[in-house]
A protein has these predicted regions:
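Long, compositionally biased interface segments
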Residues: 153-255
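OB-fold ssDNA-binding interfaces and closely related basic DNA-contact patches used
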Residues: 1-129, 176-177, 181, 240-255
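Extended serine/threonine-enriched, polar tracts that run as long, contiguous segments within proteins
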Residues: 107-192
């Protein structure tokens, strides 16, 4: 599995010119860039991360949950929920330090799937022909958190599991003062594709990854509660760990 990213740079450390505003993925021996990709989402999850940029350190992270409903408990490694994230509407009463800390806590849309890079090139501008069906994880946040939900929610509303469709994705250039950033733009006409035995294996890998990640976080959560002298509801945490995994997958894929 590789990480899908948005390249904002015009040049790399070696002085190579890069296509800013392109999708990118670092593969063994090379980094691939493309203005457009075909993206087939297999699994969608949500995870809170608390990252302290000053010390370049991950402070806390939550389990990967299947939704963000207010009633959904999303435990984290420090024995709290959602890394202590407080809704923006409720932050007026926070101290200055606590309010600043809230800016370090981000919610990510974790999108596991495969991507085919269209008219792909490497860092030297050479064409790359084999960046096809690359298993990827895209951690979308900020301005990129919502756009992909439009075609995915449309499929869900039609009772069409998004796992069986691919989306053509490009990037829109945006400006906020002197800041330039790029936002994913997704075709609203997803294409139905075959779900192959190889795809089933890739899905199993993704689910194992999510399960492993959640198991580690739940263990840290339980350990934190014990250190604080708080009761641990073992049954509740077990249900949380299991239920966030696969109850949104088509029955044909969960056996």
């Amino acid at each position: 599995m590789f990480y899908l990213k948005i390249n904002r740079d015009h040049e790399d450390d070696s002085g190579n010119s890069l296509p800013a505003g392109s999708w990118s993925v670092s593969l063994p021996g090379t980094t691939v860039y493309a203005k457009e990709i075909d993206f087939q989402v297999f699994v969608q999850r949500y995870q809170y991360l608390h990252y302290d940029a000053e010390v370049n350190e991950m402070v806390n992270k939550s389990v990967m949950a299947k939704n963000l409903y207010p009633q959904t408990e999303i435990p984290d490694m420090l024995g709290t929920f959602r890394c202590g994230s407080v809704p923006a509407s409720q932050r007026d009463t926070l101290s200055a330090d606590k309010a600043l800390q809230q800016k370090e806590i981000k919610c990510f849309r974790m999108l596991f799937g495969k991507a085919t890079f269209i008219d792909a090139v490497d860092e030297t501008g050479k064409k790359v022909e084999d960046a096809v069906d690359v298993p990827i994880l895209w951690r979308a946040r900020g301005s990129n958190f919502m756009p992909i939900s439009v075609p995915m929610d449309a499929l869900t509303a039609q009772k069409k599991p998004f796992i069986f469709y691919k989306l053509r994705a490009s990037l829109d250039k945006k400006k906020n003062g002197g800041l330039v950033y790029y936002v994913g733009k997704f075709d609203n006409a997803p294409k139905l594709v075959d779900f192959t035995p190889e795809d089933q294996d890739t899905l199993a890998y993704f689910m194992d990854y999510i399960n492993g990640e959640n198991t580690k976080v739940i263990k840290e959560y339980d350990d934190s509660l014990r250190k604080q002298g708080r009761m641990v509801d073992q049954e509740a945490t077990t249900v949380t760990s299991d239920d966030v995994l696969n109850d949104d997958l088509p029955e044909s894929l969960t056996g």
